[in-house]
Amino acid sequence: MKKKILEVTNLHAAVNEIKIVKGLNLVVNAGEIHAIMGKNGSGKSTFAKIIAGHPDYTITNGDITYQHTSILELTPEDRAKRGIFLSFQYPIEIPGVTNADFLRLACNARRIYQGLPEMEPLEFFEYINSKLPLVDLKPSFLTRDVNEGFSGGEKKRNEILQMSILDTKLAVLDETDSGLDIDALRTVANGIKSLANDGNAIILITHYQRLLDYIKPDFVHVMQEGKIIKTGSASLALDLEKYGYDWLKNELK
């Protein structure tokens, strides 16, 4: 029997009293990769932020359970400590905080929650250096301030590096392929694939088939008007690439 990581039941959510998510249902099991696709404004990024606990969004109905426990009352920090990871579409810069310090603090916060001892700076330095080849980054990268002056590819690779050290159980990757050239896309995709295992689950939010050329999802979901209107195999993404979204209009009826 598959281990359930995430279950979203009849989820409704709003921001400033504007309804964004309107009856969304989704089950994600351990070992699965799910892709969520849809037009701009369909609610994909909002859904990602809601899973992570973004305070701007109000849940008006439904529930989100993670590892069989409702997380609606948990803060974003508590969700992260439990193993939920969100990669941002537009990662922010944090001047004055080096990557090494940021990553060590995040890693130790997760370890404390797991009942593990904190890593000392030298121990963590060895650990993080062993992870850098995963996303083709050099050790000098760790001395730079978080995302400051980074290229788009470096920002996205930095997020996959974060995912790798946090023992992530549910990764929600919001348009990780956005703004990446072919080489950077391949590096990021290979990093994501290497982190997928039978004990975690990944949700990819994307507009394009090109990311799915590198990472084959077990399920593809189409969002429209705040809910999932169709679910299929990886071939559904190919149909969307070929025909667009208009042929799915009848699914809303």
UniProtKB/Swiss-Prot annotation:
- Pfam (any one): ABC_tran
Give me the Gene Ontology terms describing cellular component: chloroplast
Q: Where is the signal peptide?
A: none
Annotated ATP binding sites: 38-45
- SUPFAM superfamilies reported in the protein's UniProt record: P-loop containing nucleoside triphosphate hydrolases (SSF52540)
User: Keywords on this record?
Assistant: ATP-binding, Chloroplast, Nucleotide-binding, Plastid, Transport
ABC transporter domain segment(s): 6-250
Family assignment from sequence similarity: Belongs to the ABC transporter superfamily. Ycf16 family.
Q: What is this protein called?
A: Probable ATP-dependent transporter ycf16
